[in-house]
């Protein structure tokens, strides 16, 4: 079994130019949506007005922006750092995921402090339960990535298989994060501020980057890795 590389997969040779440009445009839009939605949630939260106000801010930074961009780094058409080497992209991926974990930890700390101070019970909604599972899965993914970064120190014998698991589970974790964000939009806090057609638009925004990322991983990496295992 040959060592597996994580790199950019070129587009098919006979692919129409229009299709190629449409795919690139969808990637640019995914970056804009990830950034714009994070800014929107930050403005909506009015950080500093309460302990709770920091929770959506840091969680949006963690999952809607940092994690999304860390995954898109490896996209053949959508990466903002397409000019970087594979080694540099891996380092940037680690930096993005580390920042995501730090922001998620801060977001968790603020919501626990807020509910404790208000004497409210924890884990009473689907949003909180799925969010807790997402945080746990994110931590497991980080450990898996650490093993891939230092396979000899971690005594990993089947690196190719672990990379496949890391890719597949990484997609699942990001989709779990997207579901958590969607469930948060059903909260009293969010629905008190966003109503009508605007609410449905907000519901669609986090789904779009998730679809782009799902297509990226399933099309460009998973079939290739299964063949090389």
Curated annotation (Swiss-Prot):
Cofactor mode of binding and number, as noted: Binds 2 heme b groups non-covalently.
Protein task: Probable transmembrane reductase that may use ascorbate as an electron donor and transfer electrons across membranes to reduce monodehydro-L-ascorbate radical and iron cations Fe(3+) in another cellular compartment.
Chain sites annotated for binding heme b 2: 93, 166
MF terms (GO), sorted A to Z: metal ion binding; transmembrane ascorbate ferrireductase activity; transmembrane monodehydroascorbate reductase activity
Keyword annotations from UniProtKB, A to Z: Electron transport, Heme, Iron, Membrane, Metal-binding, Translocase, Transmembrane, Transmembrane helix, Transport
Residue sites binding heme b 1 per the record: 55, 127
The protein's enzyme class: translocase
Domain named Cytochrome b561: residues: 22-224
PANTHER family assigned: OS05G0565100 PROTEIN, TRANSMEMBRANE REDUCTASE CYB561D1-RELATED
Topology with respect to the bilayer: Multi-pass membrane protein
Catalytic activity: monodehydro-L-ascorbate radical(out) + L-ascorbate(in) = monodehydro-L-ascorbate radical(in) + L-ascorbate(out); Fe(3+)(out) + L-ascorbate(in) = monodehydro-L-ascorbate radical(in) + Fe(2+)(out) + H(+)
Record-linked PROSITE patterns: CYTOCHROME_B561
Pfam families: Cytochrom_B561 (PF03188)
Protein name (database record): Probable transmembrane reductase CYB561D1
Ranges of the Cytoplasmic topological domain: 1-24, 75-91, 150-169, 215-229
Membrane topology, Lumenal segments: 46-53, 113-128, 191-193
Cofactor: heme b
Single GO cellular component term: membrane
